[in-house]
């Protein structure tokens, strides 16, 4: 005799077993930090995730943040400034990627719409792979290789759009140092890679269908987007030479002890006090 209650219990157990992976995936998504932007403790921050990874982003004191991720998906976040500029940035911390990930100064411009990266470290995949080489630049004792690529109908600060990506990838990986953004802006511009009006600029950790963790502390500031040259002022009309005041003592006559004559002398030839007496061919004096 078949026990239907036993079959029901067994079927329920099987259903739970098959449902568990789906439930865990949904739970991971629910536990991820939602995308957001804003300011925290004096720094701008940006955090974006497509929801496909179990990812946690945390703003810490000052310019510090931490991030950990797993289970796939795309995510990027960090702290910095808004707007970006040609500032000198220093950063330090720990970065532990497992798979496709990179640590970079990351930012955007508008008009033209450009996403840019100065890559300081990366995981198993060089993010510039497949991009067009545009030269190289040396900065802070290391070689950075320049690349450009086009992103078609991809997420951007203006929604889904087509835009350019600019890359500068450091040959020798590091997690900590100084990045002078003016060096890279100038190098890209010299290679014909035009930037627009700056939006945000952060020292970011990005992950793509990988796992890992990072804790990064950002500092710096100052600097600015170079201003256009000012309009030169018109030349100033030279002032006339100052007029020598007349000799003191009254009228146009020389004062006592003053010169009153001599070969080539064009000044006063009379004396307001005393008499003009020749001392030699070249000099006469009021005595």
From Swiss-Prot:
It catalyses: Endohydrolysis of (1->4)-beta-D-xylosidic linkages in xylans. One of its GO terms (biological process) is xylan catabolic process. One of its GO terms (molecular function) is endo-1,4-beta-xylanase activity. It is an enzyme of class 3 (hydrolase). Residues 1-19 form the signal peptide. Residues 31-219 form the GH11 domain. The keyword Amino-acid biosynthesis does not apply. Transmembrane segments: none annotated. Residues 252-287 form the CBM1 domain. It comes from the Eukaryota. It holds the Pfam family CBM_1. Endo-1,4-beta-xylanase involved in the hydrolysis of xylan, a major structural heterogeneous polysaccharide found in plant biomass representing the second most abundant polysaccharide in the biosphere, after cellulose. Exhibits immunity-inducing activity and induces cell death in Nicotiana benthamiana. Belongs to the glycosyl hydrolase 11 (cellulase G) family. This is Ethylene-inducing xylanase 3. It comes from Verticillium longisporum. The lineage of its organism: Eukaryota, Fungi, Dikarya, Ascomycota, Pezizomycotina. The gene is EIX3.
